[in-house]
Amino acid sequence: MSVIDSILDKADEQEIKKLNVIVDKIDALEDSMKNLSYEELKDMTAIFKNRLKKGETLDDILPEAFAVVREVSKRKLGMRQYRVQLIGGIVIHQGKIAEMKTGEGKTLVEVAPVYLNALTGKGVHVITVNDYLAERDKELMSPVYESLGMTVGVIISNQDPNIRKQQYKCDITYGTNSEFGFDYLRDNMVPDLSHKVQRELNFAIVDEVDSILIDEARTPLIIAGDGDEDLKLYELANSFVKTVKEEDFELDRKDKTIALTASGISKAESFFGITNLTDIKNIELYHHINQALRGHKLMEKDVDYVISNGEVMIVDEFTGRVMDGRRYTDGLHQAIEAKEGVEIKNESKTMATVTYQNFFRLYEKLSGMTGTAKTEEGEFESIYKLNVVQIPTNRPVIRADLHDKVFKTEEEKYSAVVEEIIRIHKTRQPILVGTVSVEKSEKLSKMLKKQGIKHQVLNAKQHDKEAEIISKAGKLDAITIATNMAGRGTDISLGAGDKEEEQEVKDLGGLYVIGTERHESRRIDNQLRGRSGRQGDPGTSRFFVSLEDDVIKLYGGKTIEKLMKRTSSNENTAIESKALTRAIERAQKGVEGKNFEIRKNVLKYDDTINEQRKVIYNERNKVLNDEDIQEDIQKMVKDIIQEAGETYLIGRKRDYYGYFKHLYSTFMPADTLLIPGVDKKSVQEIIDSTYEISKRVYDLKKMMLGIDKVAELEKTVLLKVVDQYWIDHIDAMEQLKQYIGLKSYAQKDPFKEYALEGYDMFEALNKNIREATVQYLYKFN
């Protein structure tokens, strides 16, 4: 233990010492638990719940609850939690992130904290990266939970809403981040409370927490409806962009920006038969041209997206997975569809949106697990208030992480990778090769095929075969090429379960991991390395890098340029240099910082709309929960009358005509506003008299239609009006974000401008909701 402790942060070391005291208590209960029957172990659940009712806390019953789970895990799964797994479980219960190396049995770690927190009856959500893992983990762990009297459910895509609702009612619910997030949005669009599927967001345990809370945090969840625009403009813009030359546009790959030059603008004006492309009336055309440029010059097929069944599918740059149901926004997806000659689907209109940051912050308690979180600890703390605790490994890591081999050109690098694969393959040692894109994995695959080397390819195009391919990657002679191993969730066991073969693979040195390029994030590189050397197994990792790789080319700076000039140009000569290694790491840190800024910016924008979202969703929930909204309706009426009085009656000359005309046109029935001696009354007296008349008019309506019918009408009208205006508002806020981004608000803080303009728009939204609701209710018969 002391050897491992020495490599942990001092703070973590202190934390682990404290946690070991709790684990000692759990260990002390092990013998007494062995003597209990299945029925007696199950009865402990009712005993724990009763103790909680009487005022004990989850922390009070933790040692016993963990000891119960450990015993049931042994009996049902044939697996006993190690001390380090119990430590990880306590960290998770405490609402922190447990950083545990690959192969340390993270799935078994979560069982005890899941059970403990499910005792509250408020539900626990176990969140993972795809449906396969959600269903697998649910099936794997259900025997433990069910034998303790807990119900277990799973949320998967395209599930019937009634089944979905039942799954959420379970004590423990497995599912993916996007399914939980989209259900939250959909629940806040339902016309009736019975259509909601989720209950309160109590406790979430996020597996591969860095992948979900960091990598995916740049892409907000969006529910969209079809827009009503002309799709021909995408085809025209696409035809034009095919004619442009390099001098017609300026491209910055580092910042991913592109714009027409003066010659490009002139060419566009000639192509479209207009005199001034930058005139305000041509803003829509300019936008379409710009998106077509981005689609052609910045977005690459088999890198950023793939074509599957005639559709453009986005590839997650961090995991290499196809992102089902996601579309690029602001017309970029349609521009790519035009470029690839597939069906162009209508520009979607945003109806509901939330970032992962703001969704996960809705949980009463949040925690997670991953093999790599320390590099992003600052982000976890500042955005999610989550501390990261490094959990020691059960056995020391003995994997050899070799120095990078660096080449001048990409071609030299790939030739060397193929040579290394051939050399290692002759020994029969299994090899895992990590690539950064579908395109690169297929390039390497072709090179190996030319040499007659049998291998497997795992990328966004083979998503359905993922688990099967990975499960065999540790066998003798196996060569597996994988796009970004991040979040794969399946352990690579040496020998794939065959004990004799496992020993043979160990004797050969375990799994050999080759990285063909440094990723933008050091964390993703560490995840690839961590596929090897699990549970004290031997293993080796090495990265092959070229000075033409994106991270080095875009972010390497002057150090790399100098190194390029100094090194010899001999073919296939690897450059080995401490300065170069440091430069690569500096480049990666630079990109990580930049990506953090992007995610912070996404959150800054969403924080503005998040406050508005809370107000609107609370309003909807009041209606759905059958709360009396009579007072709210009357307040709306009062506000409309007050605003009218302040607009038309305050000043040197009172505009009685304007005042009454406005109220008649807004909601009051004709000839009802008869106020004797109006010119002798104060402004407030006129407003109060008007309000009293409006109340009498509404009371008369209730008598005619019946109180119950009017109450039902109020709810129906308010829901419809809120939804209609909120959807328009969200879409307008999305457009405002794009507009502010384009204008860049010279000398102004774009986030401040967005917040200020967003506030004004929200005030206008509330005014529109008030007037439309009151108008419908007063004028409906």
Curated annotation (Swiss-Prot):
SMART domains registered for this protein in UniProt: HELICc, SecA_DEAD, SecA_PP_bind
Annotated residues for binding of ATP: 85, 103-107, 491
Signal sequence residues: none
Record membrane topology: Peripheral membrane protein
PROSITE patterns attached to this UniProt entry: SECA, SECA_MOTOR_DEAD
Catalytic reaction equation(s): ATP + H2O + cellular proteinSide 1 = ADP + phosphate + cellular proteinSide 2
Keyword check for ATP-binding: yes
Catalytic class of the enzyme: translocase
GO MF, one example: ATP binding
Biological process, per Gene Ontology: intracellular protein transmembrane transport; protein import; protein targeting; protein transport by the Sec complex
Main localization (coarse): membrane
Cellular component aspect of the GO annotation: cell envelope Sec protein transport complex; cytosol; plasma membrane
Location within or outside the cell: Cell membrane; Cytoplasm
Keywords: ATP-binding, Cell membrane, Cytoplasm, Membrane, Nucleotide-binding, Protein transport, Translocase, Translocation, Transport
EC number: 7.4.2.8
Protein family (similarity comment): Belongs to the SecA family.
Entry-linked HAMAP family: SecA
Function of the protein: Part of the Sec protein translocase complex. Interacts with the SecYEG preprotein conducting channel. Has a central role in coupling the hydrolysis of ATP to the transfer of proteins into and across the cell membrane, serving as an ATP-driven molecular motor driving the stepwise translocation of polypeptide chains across the membrane.
Assembly behavior: Monomer and homodimer. Part of the essential Sec protein translocation apparatus which comprises SecA, SecYEG and auxiliary proteins SecDF. Other proteins may also be involved.
Name of the protein described by the UniProt record: Protein translocase subunit SecA 2
Species of provenance: Clostridioides difficile (strain 630) (Peptoclostridium difficile)
